[in-house]
């Protein structure tokens, strides 16, 4: 199984917010940042590690793709929305 922090970074990169959101189509029905962040907290991952190795790592990936003109503003906005969803769980820490 893929490391949960890597899964969070991948979901942020792809803009996968939660399981019920059908975007992106290839990840339909899979858990998103919302569920994975909660799972990481339940597994006692430090919030700072979830932030740096999960959420920020995913935004760095999408930022690199944007600089290389491989993605466009809508994809970056979906990634930002996904990161914000994860941040909602980390705000209490």
Language model features by range: what are they?
Residues 1-92:
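Long amphipathic alpha-helical segments
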């Amino acid at each position: 199984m893929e490391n949960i922090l890597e899964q969070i970074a991948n979901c942020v990169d792809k803009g996968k917010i939660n399981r019920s959101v059908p975007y992106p189509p290839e990840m339909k029905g899979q858990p998103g940042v919302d569920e994975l962040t909660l799972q990481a907290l339940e597994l006692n991952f430090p919030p700072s590690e979830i932030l740096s190795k999960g959420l920020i790592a995913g935004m760095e990936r999408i930022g690199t793709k944007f600089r290389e003109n491989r993605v466009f503003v809508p994809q970056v906005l979906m990634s930002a929305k996904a990161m914000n969803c994860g941040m909602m769980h980390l705000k209490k820490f």
